[in-house]
C-alpha cells in the first residue's frame, strides 16, 4: 500500500501557487537523487554497467591469463590462442520502486515540505534497497574469514588482503581498487584491536595506546575511509545482523561484483481524480551479480552492540 499524505499529516508551509503538480515532480526528483547516495555506499564500490536503450541484458566477458615463455634464438614462437575467455557473465535488470499519494488539499496549499519529505523518503528507500541488494552478494563469496561470535581483528583484514593480492588462479590476483565494506560494529572492534584495548564500553582507553600507526588510526576513527593495509574501510550500516548478532561484510575488488543499471532512478506523477490527489512514483531499474568469485572474501564476525 502506498504512503498517503494529506493536510492532516503535515502542517502547511507556504502559500498556494500555480503549476503545483508540475512543480511536484521536479522537486521530488531533485530530493530523491540527493538522498540516494548517502543511503547506498556500496554502489560506488562495485563495477557499474549501463544497460543501453533497446537491450534487456549486458554480457561481461572475463578474460583469463596468458603465459609468456623464454625464447631461443632461431626457434619459432609457438602461437598462443587468445584472448582466452575464462568466463562470461550475463546480467538482466528488474524494477524497484515506491509510491506515495499526496492529496489535492496538501498540494493546493503549497506545502512544499510534504513534497521534499516524499523525495527524501523515496530516495532513501530506493538507495537502501539497492545497497542491500549489493550486500546480499557478500554471502556468495566462496572464501570466508572469521567465525560467528568472534570479533574481526587487524589480522583478519591482513589475511583477506594477502589472499586477494596473491591468488594465482585462472583470473590472477584481484585488481585494484580493493575495499572493505563492514558493519559499524565490526569496524569498532577493528579499532579496539588496533588500539590494544578491551572490547568494552567502559574500559576503552584503560590501556596505553601505542604510538605510531595505532595512534593515528584511533585519532582518525570515524573520519571515514582510512585504509588498513592499503584498503579503505567503508562503514555499511545496511549490513544486517543475524539472530546471534553476527554480521557479514566483505573485502573485495571493485571488479569482483557488478551493478547493471537500466534506469538509475526516475520520478513520475499520476493524477487520481476519484481519490482527489496525485500519486508520486519513484522507480529504479537494476540488476546485480558476482563477476569473479576469487576477487572477494566474506568477512564474518561478531557485531553485537555494547550496552
Task: Give the ranges of each region predicted by the language model.
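Protruding loop/beta-arch "assembly-hinge" segments enriched in small, turn-prone residues
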Residues: 1-39, 224-226, 240, 247-307
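N-terminal "assembly arms/tails" that initiate or stabilize quaternary assembly
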Residues: 1-88, 294
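Signature of extracytoplasmic/envelope-associated structural regions
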Residues: 2-19, 23, 32, 50, ...
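Short helix/loop capping segments that flank catalytic or ligand/cofactor-binding pockets
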Residues: 68-71, 110, 189-192, 199, ...
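Short acidic, glycine/tyrosine-flanked loop/strand segments centered on an H-E-D-like triad
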Residues: 83-109
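Alpha-helical scaffold segments that mediate packing/assembly in large oligomeric complexes
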Residues: 103-173, 298-307
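Extended, solvent-exposed, turn-rich assembly/linker loops in the middle of proteins
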Residues: 140-221
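Extended serine/threonine-enriched, polar tracts that run as long, contiguous segments within proteins
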Residues: 219, 225-243
